Amino acid sequence: MIRLGDKMKDNFIKIIKSIIVFLLFVIVFAAGFILLGFFKGEKIENPISDISGPKDEFLFLLAGVDSTGEETGTRTDTLMLIKADSNNNTVDMISIPRDSYVSINGKMDKINAAHSYGGIDLTMSVVRDFLGINLDKYMVISFEAVIKGIDALGGMDVDVSQDVAAAMGISPGIHTMSGDEVLKYVRFRKGYQNADLGRINTQQDFLKQFIKEATKPSNLPKLPKVYAAMKPYIKTNMNIKDLSSLAMKFKFADSSNLNSVRLEGEGFNMGGISYYKIYPESIENIRSTYLNSFLRN
């Protein structure tokens, strides 16, 4: 017979683990440590006290850069909209190809150039205008954070698919990687049939694998060390109290609830430079299917 106390303990562990899963996803590695009190008394840059949009949905832009120390001069290597829906216990990862041909300050350019011209503020503005959405929250993560976080975790087992293995010239299956090796893995692009899109698929798959790895019972005690290693390389304007409250709604969230999509289009060359033209119908599909609650009036 299972005692009531045991049931309560099991439920508590499941809830705590699911919260950590969601929070880990929110900032890709570090926000899960909110539960351990690491943000108590710390100042969050430009905190946002009100969550815009419907109460059961949450949207922010995740940007991966070479360095978070400079506001301009660095292009984004990864751009991804993250939308969490507590009604359906789902998290959507909407990748924006970095070569997407968009308008930046009235001139056409690659979307990843926005950060080099005006930092995360201009990047946010370009994404808002390009998709016609309301968006005010962001997370900027330096790739140094990936190296530091994975190493603090003691390395990571990565399941490399047949297609990715063929592109990278390695054997498929499980590879134990260091932080530096993981970074090279998620940034690799030359061997794919379509370099940028192939890398997007790899990055989305990696996020799912990391969440599964980081939330293994044996790894949970390592999270404070992982957070301490990554914290200097992460910048956000999100209010930690809001994220903690939101995460409490995700009692049943796990890696199987993560949905990966991307803006579709086709590549073209102009002046010796490769660009990616997003199909208008793909924009409308993403807007109506995933971003309907955040559309501009």
Feature names for model-found ranges:
Residues 3-4, 9-297:
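Non-catalytic, solvent-exposed segments at the cell envelope interface
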